[in-house]
Amino acid sequence: MENNNEYVVDKINHLINIAEDGKEGYENAAEEIKDSGVKGSFLLFAQDRLVYASQLREIVGQLHGEAEDKGGGSVGSLHRVWMDIKSTFTGGDADAIINTCITGEEAAIKEYKLVLDDDEIPESCKPLIGKQLNGIEQALASIKSHVHEKV
C-alpha cells in the first residue's frame, strides 16, 4: 500500500505542476496580449489553475504525502518555456500567444486523462480530477471559439 500511495502522490504532484505551469503561462499570456477580452479570460484561467493546484495539494495531504514545491512538470515546463520564447519573438502577437495556449491546454488534457484512466488512482480522487479536466476542456473550447470569431 505504501508504494501505491507514493505512486498516487507522484501522479497528483504531476497534475499540481501542470496546474501551476498553466497559471504562469496564462499570466504571461495576459501580460503580452493586447485584446482586453482575451486578457480577462486568460486571467480567469490563471485563477482557475491556482484553485486546481490548491485542491490537488489537499488530496496529497489526505494521502499523507508531501506536495512538491513549484518545479513544473515536464509537459508544463515545456509549455512555460515555449510561452516565454514565443512572446519574446512575436512581440505579443495574439495569434502566436493563443496558439501556444491551445498547445498547452491540449497537453494538460492529455496528462489529466492519463491520470483519470490510471487504475492505481483511487476512485475518491477521480471526481475532482475529472472536474478540473472539464474546466481545462472548457477553457480550450473558449480559446478556440475566440480564434473562430476572428476568422
Model-derived segments and their meaning:
Residues 58-96, 100-103, 107-109:
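Carboxylate-rich helix-loop segments that flank metal/cofactor sites and access channels
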Residues 39-75, 146-150:
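Conserved alpha-helical segments that form or flank metal/cofactor-binding pockets of metalloenzymes
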